[in-house]
Amino acid sequence: MRTTISQLKEMKQNKQKIAMLTAYDYPTAQILDKAGIPAILVGDSLGMVVLGYDSTVSVTMEDMLHHLKAVVRGSQKAMVIADMPFMTYHLSPEQALLNAGRFMQEGGAQAVKLEGGVNVADKVKRIVDCGIPVMGHIGLTPQSVNQLSGFKVQGKTLTAALALLEDARALEKAGAFAIVLETMPAELAAMITAAVSIPTIGIGAGENCDGQVQVVSDMLGMFTDFVPKHTKKYADLNGIISKAVSGYVTEVAKGEFPTLKESFTLDKKVLEELKKCVSSEQ
């Protein structure tokens, strides 16, 4: 049985923090699921951390569906939430509904996530009205990074802070079951969390959100080029993997791998007969 919306709402009511991580493949989903993560986000961040794009803007529905299916297959208990890519819900509520439906029918997701507040409330309502759960996302919205002039903290002025509060209320009214609050002052995130009855999931939004989400590649230390301020590295997989690969290369070069332990052998009788056959052909 997977985590339900009701369970997430109960966690907020009971002041139990919600832990969420991204996953993009089968083995990672298995690990997260066994570790007890209640919710897994198949984020469009895969464009940057898996596919090597400069931003999430280039990610397509096909990209997302490919990875979503793997994560669903690799998990049994976690709610799997699929990120709706850039320009897959912006044109109309009908477009949003059709693409959200693909994630549910083809990908096996339990919910979808989309970026925006007041400006996407009509899309959220249309999707929810047809029975598809929606998670909102406000603050720093990566798909709008060009309009926002880069990855910058949002809501730092009175006007901007009030606009984000309005966005959160609009998403709740439209039927969203939770909202991601990204890269905003902790005080503002706390106010938004108190202002809505649905769970808030923070990423760079302080400790007072109802839960937290991180990009799994960041928190596991897969990359050394850039580590977001809001990320805590719980492991150094980049170093561990690099050391392992270097060891493999060295052992192969020296003829130390594989050994008899990693090899398969013929029955002695078969081997002798094979040698006779080969020698008779020469």
Swiss-Prot record:
Cofactor(s) required for function per UniProt: Mg(2+)
EC class name: transferase
Pathway in which the depicted protein is active: Cofactor biosynthesis; (R)-pantothenate biosynthesis; (R)-pantoate from 3-methyl-2-oxobutanoate: step 1/2
EC number in record: 2.1.2.11
One of the record's GO cellular component terms: cytoplasm
Record: active site: E182
Keywords attached to this entry: Cytoplasm, Magnesium, Metal-binding, Pantothenate biosynthesis, Transferase
Main location: cytoplasm
Biological process according to GO: pantothenate biosynthetic process
Cofactor comment: Binds 1 Mg(2+) ion per subunit.
Catalytically driven reaction(s): 3-methyl-2-oxobutanoate + (6R)-5,10-methylene-5,6,7,8-tetrahydrofolate + H2O = 2-dehydropantoate + (6S)-5,6,7,8-tetrahydrofolate
Subcellular location, record wording: Cytoplasm
Gene3D superfamilies in alphabetical order: Phosphoenolpyruvate-binding domains (3.20.20.60)
Pfam families linked: Pantoate_transf
Binding site for 3-methyl-2-oxobutanoate: D44, S45, D83, K113
Binding of Mg(2+), residues: D44, D83, E115
Keyword Magnesium: yes
Biological function: Catalyzes the reversible reaction in which hydroxymethyl group from 5,10-methylenetetrahydrofolate is transferred onto alpha-ketoisovalerate to form ketopantoate.
PANTHER family: 3-METHYL-2-OXOBUTANOATE HYDROXYMETHYLTRANSFERASE
UniProt-listed NCBIfam families: panB (TIGR00222), PRK00311.1 (NF001452)
Family (UniProt): Belongs to the PanB family.
Record text on subunit structure and interactions: Homodecamer; pentamer of dimers.
Record protein name field: 3-methyl-2-oxobutanoate hydroxymethyltransferase
Species per Swiss-Prot/TrEMBL record: Dehalococcoides mccartyi (strain ATCC BAA-2266 / KCTC 15142 / 195) (Dehalococcoides ethenogenes (strain 195))
Annotated gene: panB
